[in-house]
């Protein structure tokens, strides 16, 4: 993996509040190497280490994107949902930003069946077929389509399991993380001071509550993915 310069600025991270952790009573002792201080009852993350692991993650996704790998971004917290969707769309990644349905990856055949149903319903709606059905049947199928759009809309073009999964909040997305571990799918995980840094392939210590912090981390990662995709297109 070639190391590159990703314009990761400590001052920019401080302005985004990346360094603010959870209260000192809500911490995981395994995070001790990533904590630099305690201040007013909260842990402060060591931003030098954050920059190091964020840079490593950017290198990884650049290399993966440059050979055509596929990414999934998972972040279902309400405050992060829009940022997850916009970042994923910008980098042409799949995303889950409403709810991780249990077995979404470990029971891929079921997910695939749901996706086929979703695509069929979308096609029927675009063709105006739903409007030609009896009102009761049309209403039922439209509700079904709305439900599928909410939970599968971000992965509607997926045809197989992702090559790398980016997880925005370890505790919130623990089910998704465990499924990735079960399947051996590499993960990049944003971890706060109450998380376990040993669960993901690359853990980025950072504030997972502040939207500015989440956006900064996401922007760096998707910029690296976009650069990698450009490299892939040039080499095709």
UniProtKB/Swiss-Prot annotation:
One of its GO terms (biological process) is translation. Signal peptide: none annotated. InterPro entries: Ribosomal_uS2, Ribosomal_uS2_bac/mit/plastid, Ribosomal_uS2_CS, Ribosomal_uS2_flav_dom_sf. This is Small ribosomal subunit protein uS2c. Its main location: plastid. GO terms for molecular function: structural constituent of ribosome. It comes from Calycanthus floridus var. glaucus (Eastern sweetshrub). Disulfide bonds: none annotated.
